[in-house]
Amino acid sequence: MSRGKTIRPSYYDEDESSQDELEYTLNKGRSNIGSESDSDVDEMSKISFGALNRAQTKLNKNNQKHKPSSWKENINNSSEEFFDSDSDSDGPPEETSSKDTKKKKNKHAPSESSSKRPVSRIRDIPGLPSRKQQTLHTDIRFDAAYGKADLIKARKDYAFLDEYRKQEIASMESLLKDKKNKLNDDEREEIKLQLQSLKSRMDTLKNRDLENNILSNYKKQQMESFKEGKVNKPYFLKRSDKRKILQKAKFDSMKPKQREKAMERKRKKRLGKEFRQLEFRPTNR
């Protein structure tokens, strides 16, 4: 007749019962190493993870003097991996991929790269736009690698765009003047800004065309006079002379109101320069 399993009622606290379970498992592990029955498996399955963890740490402390350091490291690593893993998950263990990138210990530390791959000459710096994004929508006709761009030739080739710009300016002005259009304040302000930028662009293009015409005409006159023998050698203008000639030509081509505005800006600029020269800092008493 087989003996029945005696179960004693637990009248201890939770800490004391876990300590008793710990001592019981330690004594039983020392006595019955290698022999494991079904009843032992059932009893072990009822023990909490906290008791198992304390048993593992106590075993490690007792066997530190008898085992080499490599064995200790393996035991500690296996126990940490076991108790750090999620105990509630019933699925298979996750596979760690070998292609995982190493994370930096510090964000200011230099980035690490494998020595097995060749390093590219052009590197992407974090925080700055990559070279591929910068050169994705660039026009190769204006690329510096193909030489310096000829602005005069480009202006002649794309002179037809001025007509489209004038039409766009006229349509914007009519849109702003028309009171039937129910435009918000934000939309009206945005149209005004676009109109102002288009007008300023047209003015800069006109000034550039005027400068190119004046300088080209001056060069032609010098070369013609040199060919006719009036001048021993052609005279090429200095920067200061160019500035004076261009300024005079701009003033002649301006309307009276534009001329007054330009003179007012120049006067304010000169006064500001004089005030900056006369400024002084008060002495500290």
Swiss-Prot record:
Origin superkingdom: Eukaryota
Residue span of region Disordered: 1-20, 26-137, 247-285
Coiled coil: 165-209
Comp. bias regions, Acidic residues: 81-93
UniProt keyword list: Coiled coil, Nucleus, Ribonucleoprotein, Ribosome biogenesis, rRNA processing
Compartments, record wording: Nucleus, Nucleolus
GO BP: any one term: maturation of SSU-rRNA from tricistronic rRNA transcript (SSU-rRNA, 5.8S rRNA, LSU-rRNA)
GO annotations of cellular component type: 90S preribosome; nucleolus
Entry keyword annotation includes Nucleus: yes
Basic and acidic residues bias (residue ranges): 249-263
Keyword Glycoprotein annotated: no
Alphabetized PANTHER family for the sequence: RIBOSOMAL RNA PROCESSING PROTEIN 36 HOMOLOG
Complex formation: Associates with 90S and pre-40S pre-ribosomal particles.
Family: Belongs to the RRP36 family.
Function in brief: Component of the 90S pre-ribosome involved in the maturation of rRNAs. Required for early cleavages of the pre-RNAs in the 40S ribosomal subunit maturation pathway.
Protein name: rRNA biogenesis protein RRP36
